[in-house]
Amino acid sequence: MALTISISCFSSYFVSLLLLVLSSFSFVCFSLSTVSISHISNQTLVCALNNHSYLQCSSFPLNSIPFSLTGNLRNRRFSGVVSGNGFVCGLISRLDSNTSTLLCWRFSVDGTNMLHKRIYHGPELEELEAGNFRICGVERVSRRLRCWQPYYLPRPDNYRSIALGDNFFCGLSQPPGMISCEGIAKVPSGDHYIAIAAGSRQACAITVDNDVECWGQTQSLPREKFLALAVGEDRGCGVRWSNGTVVCWGNNNNFSLPQTLKDIHFTSIYAKGPMFCGVATRNYTLICWGNENFKSGVFTPFQGLISQVVMPGPCRRECPYRPLSGSQSLCGNELMICDLKRNDGEFPDTRAQNSKNKTWSRRNIAFLVVGCVGTFSLLLVISFLIFKSHCRCRVHDSGRLDDTRTIDIPKLEKRLCTLASLGNPGQLMEFSIDELALATDGFSVRFHLGIGSFGSVYQGVLSDGRHVAIKRAELTNPTLSGTTMRHRRADKDSAFVNELESMSRLNHKNLVRLLGFYEDTEERILVYEYMKNGSLADHLHNPQFDPLSWQTRLMIALDAARGIQYLHEFIVPPVIHRDIKSSNILLDATWTAKVSDFGLSQMGPTEEDDVSHLSLHAAGTLGYIDPEYYKFQQLTTKSDVYSFGVVLLELLSGHKAIHNNEDENPRNLVEYVVPYILLDEAHRILDQRIPPPTPYEIEAVAHVGYLAAECLMPCSRKRPSMVEVVSKLESALAACLTAPKTETVSRSNTY
């Protein structure tokens, strides 16, 4: 195991040198596709990049899934597309900045209710592949593997191509072409593979002889040589090496290519479930087969559209052999689509070529390895020591497609490997369970502070004397059913991952600091700095706590606003908290307020995304949720502004967001207080537990009331940004600390 780790770390430093020397062995195998197939219920959605690289989709039965792009995305050039059960994702790559953005659309069981979400923005992805439930990609420069939806992988590798099944992953390494898999047995050995593909429960690879080898739940294979493969559910198809036509097999020998397609030559083929699609070489039109409901066994998704031509492959910066004829005009920007044939008409990576270079390659590879080890031995030792722990990490799950969990994950992804590799300043510690148990006297009731949405919270003292707050998730409950328990566990895992990822990259005096974590199969624990004075909700709503003065309330409001402003304005992409409330604003020993609990947080859109919001199911706490977000499921930073407006009303009135009126009937704080503010009668709703504001405080209190009303505007576009909120609170606090001015407070922009 140690040897594997050191070689992996070593290769990350010298991969460019190795590739330069081994350029004779360049593989023409790509896992970035321009066609995708998605199934949900009895409906199918086929998407492809047309000859302008625009994303277009067609469903079967016709128009059963009303998928369409909006705004600037209609004319946005995509570099690839992948799909799975109920989702479609498009990759946008910017060559000028070497970055990629991955946008995903998820649709409901009936094919409606499209939800749009960006799940990645970072270093350029050169390879991208999706199974039915998850997505993985490979960065172009570092060859680092990234996956979305939790996925168990033992280590990052320098993958040239990847393939995903329902519960397994396979990768084809950089030359010399070895296959490694997780979640599937009987993986072939050797270093003579040039392409790889996966279906639901089986995977196949093409050798340098152009033979096919399959593993998993395999079917009998035709004795043919292949140029390209597509593997579906218990079936597969391949492009013949000899002439570019297609042959299919599987389904207990009951699956074959429709007779009408026997003589058609294909440039590329794709599969998902029972269905296959191929790009015809003659005119680059897309033809699909495999669905028993297709008329004559064939479906042409884009027939009748103005642009029936689809991209026959991904646009690349360079090709090992020649580019596909005419592809430069399709790609532009000096990009090209790679042809699998060399200029002499032969197919690459045949045994003849391999035999010709075999003696040279074996000898020179040996000299190369010995020379590199001798020359860079010192760097190798240093690299091994630095990355010894990190290279054992499992691959980072860079985001979630959504909150749905379709498989059982044995253990959460450890984030420290990726955080360290990105140079993250979070400095998170991974605590041991023994250390945390010792800090809390075995999680004793004496140290128990309360119960939150994530689980129980304990006060503890670490061995170095630091006072900490420890959140321990409650993953099991004998009173809940199995299904409910699985959903509950998934929610806890999601909150754990969100908190870990969000807090590890945030650093602000008005955000609670995450110190570290512990996780294993049965435990999810987060360790924070200890906040001695509890939460704002405690001091506003718990009679056992002394009420706060008006000046202290304004200072707390300003502190919390500055923390939220940092999330919205100083983090790229911005972080939307989604659960701003008084119980998530904590107070330290000096009464400095800090925002906490990032379990529901989401990364918001940036200007580069060409979208103004995220389409997500509403989440948060009743009474604080933005009505526009709740109704239209469109999340923006202004949703946090609304929630903060409710907190301001709590500070003014002392009431909870949802509380009982004089008749013991539930009452919404916004509906109760805002009308008084608009009538300039805010004095009627002020907290009666403390004396009325002094002449030095009345202007500031009125100012906060008007600001709260602005934050609670029904239309999110009319709400102030957190920059404006901070500015107005600073003015209010200044008014509170000095003699009142003669002019009155402005209510402009309020309703």
Curated annotation (Swiss-Prot):
Q: Which residues cross the membrane?
A: 367-387
**Database matches in InterPro entries:** Kinase-like_dom_sf, Prot_kinase_dom, Protein_kinase_ATP_BS, RCC1/BLIP-II, Ser/Thr_kinase_AS
Pfam families reported for this sequence: Pkinase (PF00069)
Q: Which residues lie on this side of the membrane: Extracellular?
A: 32-366
- Where would you find this protein in the cell? Membrane
Q: Which residues are glycosylated?
A: N42, N51, N98, N243, N254, N283, N357
Q: Which residues form the Protein kinase domain?
A: 443-733
**SMART domains for the chain:** S_TKc (SM00220)
Official protein name in the record:
Serine/threonine-protein kinase-like protein CCR4
Q: Which organism is it from?
A: Arabidopsis thaliana
